[in-house]
Amino acid sequence: MTKLEVCCYSVDCAITAAQSGADRIELCAGQREGGLTPSYGALRGAREKIAIPVHPIVRPRGGDFCYNATEFAAIKYDIEQVREMGFPGVVVGALNEEGHIDLPKMREIMAVAQGMAVTFHRAFDMCLNPYIALEQLTDLGVSRILSSGQQQTAENGLRLLRELTQASRGPIIMAGSGVRLTNVHKFQQAGIRELHSSAGQWTSSPMRYRKIGVSMCSDTELDEFSQYCVDGDVVEAMKRAVSPDREMQYVS
């Protein structure tokens, strides 16, 4: 059975995804930066209101995945908090200066995250050698790897995703980036059994007064009066598309 993980940038979105049939939530902040560690308030809200598994991302900043000592300390503190709050899993990753898995840091992360399922996030798509990385993450005991097959979209990276799925002796390969209703069957046909999607759309802010010429972001072209929200209808449609009955249609 194909599982659908929905990437959510708020508790409200996570509630919508859960009610619409998602199998798991990746809880994030910072949509425009590709996902950052959610606040304590968001974490607490998710624990109180969502029954399906929620795996928060722990990522202290946008940009690359090579962390200094201060940033790495923050990562470990955040993982401790996530574990103590009772979350079943966490999404995290670290690379070294040469683009390989940062093994010393990842060993510490695995120790701190003991008892939780660890997903190595799309830092995997920025690493030098995905096959070596897969072996290293297998030895570390990582539960799954979120990847676009080292391409901008998972559909473009499907060949590598298929190869990694066939080669993996442990971690589940979960396809993410550009996974949508129109292409889920391609991943199923490739033997990929976990999919990651934001399953939503940009929605306009309810604010009627909108100050012109002032931005809270250095990129003044960004629309700050919109936010990305999960669409429950899209989640439901994707779940129907990956149902066992549909899977049999793709196989036959």
Curated annotation (Swiss-Prot):
A molecular function (GO) term: copper ion binding
GO cellular component terms given for this protein: cytoplasm
Subcellular location: Cytoplasm
Chief subcellular location: cytoplasm
Protein name (record): PF03932 family protein CutC
SUPFAM superfamilies found in the cross-reference section: CutC-like (SSF110395)
Protein's UniProt keywords contain Phosphoprotein: no
Coiled coil location: none
Keyword field contains Cytoplasm: yes
Family: Belongs to the CutC family.
UniProtKB keywords: Cytoplasm
Lineage of the species this protein comes from: Bacteria, Pseudomonadati, Pseudomonadota, Gammaproteobacteria, Enterobacterales
